[in-house]
Amino acid sequence: MSTAMDWERWARAFEEIDGPDAFAALFAEGGRFCDPVTPWTTNVRKVATDTDAIFPDWSQRVDRIRGGDDWAVFEWTGTATFKAGNGPGIPIAMQGATVVEVDDDGKVTSWRDYLDTNEPTTQIQTGLERALEGG
């Protein structure tokens, strides 16, 4: 009987999580997170809370995942709406890749996101410019 991690099943479950508590529940005690704007931290609930504050409707699809017994790499597409004040919502889409390591219980011990932070920034700037122009 194999004890190998079922990464496809993990990916589908990950796609369904909603909110900071659900994201934090993926992690083992002391599990760490890092991305291009967040240095390594164990406060993964805050990471999710901060993301929700910027993109309340954030949704992430795992496009492809590969891994071993205690690690995986996945490519993803995230979509959301950025809303500044009373202005119109600006839809964004971004792509990235994530490297995760898990413990024997399948809980994340290390999560590192790789993404181009200019991708959503450019989309937001373009959306704001269009709104100012009346379009």
Located regions from the model:
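A solvent-exposed, acidic/Ser-Thr-rich amphipathic alpha-helical stretch
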Residues: 4, 13, 18-71
